[in-house]
Each structure stands twice: as structure tokens, then as C-alpha cells.
């Protein structure tokens, strides 16, 4: 099926290429069974690609690819447009969107404050609304960041995000454990 449909890993994408490839594959098959349980465990550790950030442009491109492929896949299901939107944003798209936003304050961004605001303001409002509606954060800091993203409070988001990132770095430096 992969060779017949010439399904390839996306070129130039630094993160999520396996996810994008998977959705391209799903869009070519004719029968899919969806389960309510998650049988996929991501082993998150320091230094893994999943915990590293790339440029905003690279992260945003990954998000747009994910959104496009998920929308195409979910569009094949016999569900209402509202359910389609929920399925798209609850399954991986929200996480990928949050990475775009986080990369602007995660300590790897070389952009000045004005450029960061400009990039955030360039994202369509509907993305922020769908993210806020369907993303389910765990813990206070995630809930706070989600609130700031949903309501497009960019100045507070960049400030709060930077504080959280510096606090996490400080905890690692001193070897703080709970």
C-alpha cells in the first residue's frame, strides 16, 4: 500500500514526520477500527526529540500537516461536523498546536519579544478556540498555560511560559526532587 500510493515521509519536517506518514497511510486504507483505549506509550525522557523544540516555522509546519491529515482522515467518518472537529483536536492536533506556542518561550527561540508576538498573532483565532475547547490539561501549570493560549493573552503567556521554563531548568540544575 505504501509503495502503490507512493506514501513517503515528509521532507523538511523536523518533528512529527512519523505521525504525518501514519495519517497519510490511514487516508489510503479502506477499513479502520477505532478503539476507546490508548495502546501507545511514549517514553518521554530528557533529550528525546519529543521534548526538544525546533523553530516556530518548523513546529507550525508540523502542526499544519497534522491538522490537514487528521481532518482528511476524520472527514471519511460518518459523524457530524462538530464531532469531526472534536476528533481532530482531541487526538494529537492539540498537542502539536501547543508545541508551536511553547517553542516561542521554551528557551530555544532566538526571536525577540516583538517577533514572538507577531508570530502568535498570525495564527488564526479558530485554532486557539478549538485548542481551548478540546485540550484537556493536567496540573495547574498546564491549565494556566491553556487558559492563556485559549484567550490569546500573549504577553502573559510569554512571561508565564518563560518563568515556568526557567523554574524547570533551575530544578534540574539543583537536582530537586519531590
Q: What are these language model-derived features?
A:
Residues 4, 24, 69-72, 172:
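Residue-level signal for well-ordered alpha-helical scaffold segments within enzymatic catalytic domains
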Residues 13, 29, 34-35, 47-52, ...:
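Gram-positive cell-envelope targeting signals
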Residues 19, 56-61, 86-87:
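Amphipathic, non-membrane alpha-helical segments in soluble helical-bundle scaffolds
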Residues 37-46, 52-81, 95-128:
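Catalytic core of nucleotide-sugar-dependent glycosyltransferases
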Residues 105-178:
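Membrane-interface aromatic/basic loop that binds lipid-linked glycans or pyrophosphate carriers
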